[in-house]
Amino acid sequence: KIARAEVDGERLSDTEITAFCGLLFIAGGETTDKAIANMWWNLWQQPELFHHVTAHPQAWDNAFSETMRRTPAVVNEDRFTTRPVEWHGREIQAGTRVRISIGAANLDPTVFRDPLCFDPDRSDLHSGKELRSGASPEPGRAGHLGFGLGKHFCIGYELARTEAIVGSRQLVERCPNLRPAPGPATRPQIQGNSFQALLAFPLVFDPAH
């Protein structure tokens, strides 16, 4: 599809196609690993949750959705106004950079009950394949904004979800009794202007026999 894509009736050049593919690889590598680490960190804050998902592999799906709500890898996105706009009594000129906090929106108490609580089985969150609209086909449930919204929705969201879930299952299968290494605990931190991730999350496991 990329090779045949057109912009204003013209095909993309080889340079544009190469640059776009490079962006996909970089974007996926920079965010998916953080999402996986954040998910594992969240689960290990309540060890019974980690043991539950390892015993019931289908539960990884809900755990990933809740991670993308509670501690998404990307917490802020920048946009630029295309025209003057007034927002809550403040005039914003055209061409102004506006920072949108995905992380804050995902913690809106009017949308999610007890939003600071990590609960993979919460009844107010749409789990499973994300929707570009951010809505949910299920009454009473809302989608998280961890992958963005609308035309800015993450193009690689399905790959990211698959990598996180399949990768976690494989890691558990191949590393017996996988658990956090002894030592002081860390938590996901804001890095730069956009990312939320662990600085380190060492794990240990028993030798395979």
Model-derived features: where do they sit?
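Cytochrome P450
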Residues: 1-209
